[in-house]
Amino acid sequence: MGSGRRALSAVPAVLLVLTLPGLPVWAQNDTEPIVLEGKCLVVCDSNPATDSKGSSSSPLGISVRAANSKVAFSAVRSTNHEPSEMSNKTRIIYFDQILVNVGNFFTLESVFVAPRKGIYSFSFHVIKVYQSQTIQVNLMLNGKPVISAFAGDKDVTREAATNGVLLYLDKEDKVYLKLEKGNLVGGWQYSTFSGFLVFPL
């Protein structure tokens, strides 16, 4: 028994346990099995930290991630005409067709609202059609530009302003695309805006 306990002490501090339906898990005294139904991902940490936004943590360092850690969206412009949505001078680039919206955190106004603190990935592809004026597209975080992309080749019928970034966001932070310079008179059909939660913090 003594050697067995010494062997257990050598187990790494981080363990992943995946239980299958009906699989018995034995108690520490090996007397009676504990039957767990369904699937459960358990992360053991020798130095646990309390997370009040989506994870529960015990003194033993066992943390179970909440379901709202799954966040993703992708939207596209499905028509090629100048819409009235941009006439309000906000210059927010509007996407009329939402392809993916896991968690429903991408609004009908084409603004993503972060549900929790974490690292998020964003990318965009805004097409300029049939006009020679250069456009500048900014990815905005709470009203401030973070990154930009440009499209301005006069000899190309269709050109795209494209960029991507990883961002640290707090809960309720807002991310959207803004047309900083130029216009989209010819429309921006097939333009896309996508994002997802890489991991929560």
From Swiss-Prot:
Sugar attachment sites: N29, N88
Location of the protein in the cell: Secreted; Synapse
Protein's recorded name: Cerebellin-4
BP GO annotations: inhibitory synapse assembly; protein secretion; trans-synaptic signaling, modulating synaptic transmission
PTM comment, free text: Sialoglycoprotein.
First and last residue of the signal peptide: 1-27
Taxonomic lineage: Eukaryota, Metazoa, Chordata, Craniata, Vertebrata
GO cellular component: collagen-containing extracellular matrix; extracellular region; extracellular space; GABA-ergic synapse; glutamatergic synapse; synapse; synaptic cleft
SMART domains on file: C1Q (SM00110)
Protein species of origin: Homo sapiens (Human)
Record-linked InterPro entries: C1q_dom, Cerebellin_Synaptic_Org, Tumour_necrosis_fac-like_dom
Pfam family, one: C1q
Keywords for the protein's UniProt record, in alphabetical order: Disulfide bond, Glycoprotein, Secreted, Sialic acid, Signal, Synapse
Function, in words: Acts as a synaptic organizer in specific subsets of neurons in the brain. Essential for the formation and maintenance of inhibitory GABAergic synapses. Promotes the development of dendrite-targeting inhibitory GABAergic synapses made by somatostatin-positive interneurons. May contribute to the function of ventral medial habenula region of the brain implicated in the regulation of anxiety-related behaviors. May play a role in CBLN3 export from the endoplasmic reticulum and secretion.
Quaternary context: Homohexamer; disulfide-linked homotrimers. The trimers are assembled via the globular C1q domains. The trimers associate via N-terminal cysteine residues to form disulfide-linked hexamers. May form oligomers with CBLN1, CBLN2 and CBLN3 prior to secretion. Strongly interacts with DCC in a NTN1-displaceable fashion. Weakly binds to NRXN1 and NRXN2 long and short isoforms produced by alternative promoter usage. Interaction with NRXN3 short isoform is hardly detectable; no interaction at all with NRXN3 long isoform.
Gene3D superfamilies reported for this sequence: 2.60.120.40
UniProt entry tagged with the keyword Chaperone: no
